[in-house]
Structures are given as C-alpha cells and as structure tokens.
Amino acid sequence: MRGNPHIHARMIISIANQKGGVGKTTTAINLAAALAMRGKKTLLIDLDPQGNSSMSYLDVREATKSMYDVFVDKDTHLTDVIRPSSQQNLSIAPARIALAKLESRLVGELDAPFKLKDELVSLNGQFHDVVIDCPPALGLLTVNALVASTHLLIPIQSSYFALEGTDDLLETIEKVRQRPNPELQILGVVITMHDKRTALARDIQEQIRKVFGDKVFRTVISKSVRLEESPAYRESIFTFAPDSSGAAEYYSLCEEVIDRA
C-alpha cells in the first residue's frame, strides 16, 4: 500500500456528486470564498473539464497551464498553475476542457489515482484549506480528489431525482476508504437549489434527511437568481450580492463545515 505523507492543509474538501446540475460548482466557489474571507489562505482546485469554477474567478484564456498539464506533464506541477483570484486569500488552480481526455492519457499508469495527492504534498503548507470541484462523474479525476481529500461534501438538489446515483458515489467512497485513503470523512450533505414554496421540494428535503440523518447540514441553499448570476461577473456571492440570502446561506454553511471538521 502506498504511504500517506502529510499534506499540511487543515481541510481538503472534495465537492462531489456524479449528477450534474446540483449546485456543485456554486458550492465549491462560494465555500472556498467563505473560507478565504476568514483570513486563511485557500486554494480552489478545478477538476471539472467544463471549467466553470475557473471561469467564475479567472479569464482562463490567459492561463497557459492548467490542471490537465499537472496530470500529464511531469515537468508541470501544481505550483506552476496556481493563480491568484481577485478575492484576497483565494487562489485558483484552473481546469480546461482537455481534462475530459485525461482518463485515456493515463490508462495503465499505476500511480494515476495518486497524482493529485502527490502534488498537494509538494505545496508544503502554503494553503490552510483546499476545496476541490469534482466533475459530474466517478472517473479518475474524482478518484484523485477523494484519495487526496480529508473530507467530502455532497450537494444534493431538492428535486424529484435528488437521490439518483448517490449509491454509486457512496460505493466509490467506501472503496477509496478501504485502501488508498482510510481517513476520508463524509463531512456532510448540503441541500441545494431549494424552493421552499413548493410542497415537492419540502417533501424531498424530508426524504434526504431521512436517508442521511445527521449528515445533512442544517443550512439549506435556496434557489437564487443572484447565485446563478454571480459567476458571469467573476465574483463570489459575497462580493456580487453581499446582502442576499445566498451570501448568508453559504456563510452559514461555511460555519457548519468548520464546526464539523
């Protein structure tokens, strides 16, 4: 079994759900921003080939290197691709669409699931917290994130098919815990895109709480136009609409995350 070198970050949180459209990226960018607002250096790693976390803070056309290069080029390291964002204490390791081809590039490489963990070790404590935006799939990128992480946060939309696919995610988590990362903890489940005006959303929220029990955060993220708009302006909800319900909810979620970790 591979060793488990110390990464020195207090929390490394993967935001993962193989279902798309559940508020995963919105949660990643705003949780990272909330952690940075507390005065601690925070790194947001974008592993989603769509690159939405990256585009929420950066003009990715200006980035000559991305996480794809970190995985496939032995001479490119995580420190080479990290860029500062406009928000104090928050840095970004951007993604590009080329990440979608990563699995075929690394097929057969025995150390492929450990590449991100090895790169995080090399940061040697530069960041207090790390947030990883995973792709909506359970492939090599998500496995890399889970192997490298201390904690996992699962966003689930309060919609009819909310729990679809969660069994597969939980099975993957258990496989990662069995060997490469026995210390991985499920930090919790956050209900997202919730419309409290509808009976269906309220029923789904109750169902999610029955399935996951006390793993579900008290904070619920409401469906919000402001949350949808803020990435277009390359801002977190905290600078785009600081008095909005979305800002209050994500800051509350951050407080719960810190308490649980």
Regions found by a protein language model. Name each.
Residues 1-261:
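P-loop NTP-binding core
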